[in-house]
């Protein structure tokens, strides 16, 4: 180990704007996936071990879009199986799980339970670092993952009420996730992702979604 991680309290102080740390806190493993390096995987893992990041990043077991978990078949984002060939020839941003908004009632009626016992498959013991519960796919990311990017951007204008209902259900799931992260992981913060901006501007008009993000 070439550097020692910053203590939890120092990072918390920086994040909360109460003071500085002995150096800039670093989260450097976000896009460093050792298996992606093929025959250099061991070398990359060793490098990451030499330069540990200043937080324990703890992921959650996200529902799959179509496939439930063995111990909870309804722990999935939509309440029906993937049609055969649905993804053939389609990029990840052009796949449409919710093909028509008439399916929304069933999706919401069978929305995954945020009290699912396996929500946090790994609960590592505190190691002295700041603890981050990691959530992939914020509101808009989950929206386009279910509707496809082009449909999602049009939905803001053509089906705003349906979008709000979907976001409401997703927000309720996320709020319970937040509570459990604090209770079960003693998380200091939530690290979540969303597709809100481009290199030059926000991705869509803030007027469309500010109320959904306010909570």
Give residue ranges: language-model regions.
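Glycine-rich loop at the start of a catalytic domain that most often binds anionic cofactors/ligands
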Residues: 37-48, 68-75
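Active-site loop segments of alpha/beta catalytic cores
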Residues: 1-39, 102-215
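A contiguous, low-structure linker/loop signature
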Residues: 64-114, 125-134
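Short beta-alpha junction loops
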Residues: 30-32, 61-64
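N-acyltransferase acceptor-side catalytic subdomain
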Residues: 8, 28, 57-59, 76-85
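Short C-terminal domain-edge/linker segments immediately following a structured domain
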Residues: 55-62, 89, 161-166
